[in-house]
């Protein structure tokens, strides 16, 4: 495949969805609209809006949101004129009924997310999204937990259900640059040339931007990123950093770097009640290959039971826990307590 540095990259912002994890899903309507206005002014292509765990994620298991998904989506729809509104749906958490409500509220893109080996459960949701006329994306989470070849097979399933773009999703921030390269080559070898691909990176090993650059070199079309890296764990690829790097590389990203830089520092960073950065705990996520949104839950359990957050995270990684198993964090903490 010949890399085309002149093609327009699709910039997909996730500050208002993945970024929700960083503040325990407590964005106010005022916060959401201020961030959306800045992103729209900077000309990003899409803005993802939802609870951190997707439509209907607000729950005891994942954490209750300050507002409903529909309230957030409607608030963003009021202020954007350029960017399209995206949302996230995890089969088993959100249903096709919730997807229809999100569409009616203003969402026009949906990313249907499954564990990297469970694409089968996305069939109904992808098909229904296509019926609604939505830009329908398959989102293969925790992509480090299977081989490039197996990931490609799962990507092909999502394509066969109707997804027109498939994402390699590094939910644990555990992929190396070579890992990303191998996965994109395998996936693109199996998908139709007309099917787009996307990268969703996390920064737990400080490779979020580097991995996104490698993905683009391998033909990736859509890049997820967030202002100030606002996201689960050590955050996502920081949007303003990726755009600055893309600018230096001469790539066509279509966004305004300075508007993004200002929004990151003046609007988003002040909202963080825990710094979104690589530190002892978030590094443990990437090192152990643990779902990034486990961080805040593990910190609560560690404080409650007098344990080390790192020990809890490493044990979760050893047990190969995946997204949706947040309830196991307390189980692991109690097991560690018993051993100590």
UniProtKB/Swiss-Prot annotation:
Give one GO biological process term.
L-leucine biosynthetic process
- Which portions of this protein are annotated as coiled-coil regions? none
Q: Where does Mn(2+) bind?
A: 18, 200, 202
Q: Which PROSITE patterns match?
A: PYR_CT
One short Pfam family name for this protein? Answer: DmpG_comm
Sequence ranges assigned to domain Pyruvate carboxyltransferase in this UniProt record: 9-261
What GO molecular function annotations does the UniProt record carry, in alphabetical order?
2-isopropylmalate synthase activity; 4-hydroxy-2-oxovalerate aldolase activity; manganese ion binding
Where exactly is the site Transition state stabilizer? 17
Q: Which SUPFAM superfamilies match?
A: Aldolase, post-HMGL domain-like
Q: Which key words tag this protein in UniProt?
A: Aromatic hydrocarbons catabolism, Lyase, Manganese, Metal-binding
| UniProt superkingdom | Bacteria
Binding of substrate occurs at: 17-18, 171, 200, 291
Catalytic activity, as annotated: (S)-4-hydroxy-2-oxopentanoate = acetaldehyde + pyruvate
The active site annotation covers 21
Q: What is its EC number?
A: 4.1.3.39
The entry assigns this protein to a family as follows: Belongs to the 4-hydroxy-2-oxovalerate aldolase family.
Protein name, entry field: 4-hydroxy-2-oxovalerate aldolase 4
Task: Give the species.
Answer: Azotobacter vinelandii (strain DJ / ATCC BAA-1303)
